[in-house]
Amino acid sequence: MAIVLDGKKVAGQIKADLASRVAGLARMGMVPGLGTVLVGDDPGSMKYVEGKHRDCEEVGIASIRRQLPATATTEDVLAVVRDLNEDPACTGYIIQLPLPAHIDSNAIIGAIDPTKDADGMHPYNLGELVLHVRGDITTPLPCTPRGVLALLDAYGIELAGRNVCVLGRGITIGRTIGLMLTRSGVNATVTLCHTGTRNIEEHIRRADVVIAAVGVAGFVQVEHVKPGAVLIDVGVSRVFDEQAGRMRIVGDVDSEAHAVAGAYSPNPGGVGPMTRAMLLANVVEQAERMAGIREDS
């Protein structure tokens, strides 16, 4: 029977550790603060941001909320970014994506103070990840790839020398997780597949580990999966459940594929909680660097 990689359980353990560390920082007079910048009133984005602030409350991190109307301009958002860059109460912050189409997302992300980049997506921080194949990285790491690796590590799943097929080349995970998987401490062999990849099913069948992040419901079918493979489902799609009479969230991996897998992450309940836990970890680690108590500082 396949091992279920329970992201909720592992994230809970991580948050318990973070809460202890935050309490230690508080005794030193430092309270980490996470800021969120939300533009518009998209229900999905609002729900996601609300979840982040609940996580903050759970571990003792202060919440700093900034919300702008959907009509906000790039300059309006940049003004908030500059304010958070200068705010000593804000240890790190995120820009909730996607932004409205009329806003220059690259300009916004590029204006973030790299040391306050809680998502680990600033060009400087991504560059540090490219440059440092081995050794400690003292800049924030991308949350979703970091969460995937932490989930696999929690279950003792070895990646060194194994073939990993990454489906999707989005900046959130597809283009960044390969950098983390090929670091000297991990040593996986990575194949990145995308819309231009021919015979994509063959790449999936050869993989020991499949990380699916294409956002297409049921993209990975049971006949595509090598028996015993590890399936990490990152994709998010909303489909109408006729039996329940409402929309529900599903992943990229068809549930029938779980029967042949050696291990799999459920969706929801797998990678999502881990991503949120890593966001908190980035904030706490930056606070520890500021306090001079983190070894990699």
Curated annotation (Swiss-Prot):
This is Bifunctional protein FolD. Gene3D superfamilies: Leucine Dehydrogenase, chain A, domain 1, NAD(P)-binding Rossmann-like Domain. Catalyzes the oxidation of 5,10-methylenetetrahydrofolate to 5,10-methenyltetrahydrofolate and then the hydrolysis of 5,10-methenyltetrahydrofolate to 10-formyltetrahydrofolate. InterPro entries: Aminoacid_DH-like_N_sf (IPR046346), NAD(P)-bd_dom_sf (IPR036291), THF_DH/CycHdrlase (IPR000672), THF_DH/CycHdrlase_cat_dom (IPR020630), THF_DH/CycHdrlase_NAD-bd_dom (IPR020631). Its EC number is 1.5.1.5, 3.5.4.9. NCBIfam families: PRK14193.1 (NF010789). GO terms for biological process: L-histidine biosynthetic process; methionine biosynthetic process; purine nucleotide biosynthetic process; tetrahydrofolate interconversion. It catalyses: (6R)-5,10-methylene-5,6,7,8-tetrahydrofolate + NADP(+) = (6R)-5,10-methenyltetrahydrofolate + NADPH; (6R)-5,10-methenyltetrahydrofolate + H2O = (6R)-10-formyltetrahydrofolate + H(+). The keyword Cytoplasm does not apply. Pfam families: THF_DHG_CYH, THF_DHG_CYH_C. Belongs to the tetrahydrofolate dehydrogenase/cyclohydrolase family. NADP(+) binds at G168, R169, G170, T195, V236. Homodimer. The keyword Amino-acid biosynthesis applies. GO terms for cellular component: cytosol. It comes from the Bacteria. Keywords: Amino-acid biosynthesis, Histidine biosynthesis, Hydrolase, Methionine biosynthesis, Multifunctional enzyme, NADP, One-carbon metabolism, Oxidoreductase, Purine biosynthesis. GO terms for molecular function: methenyltetrahydrofolate cyclohydrolase activity; methylenetetrahydrofolate dehydrogenase (NADP+) activity. Pathway: One-carbon metabolism; tetrahydrofolate interconversion.
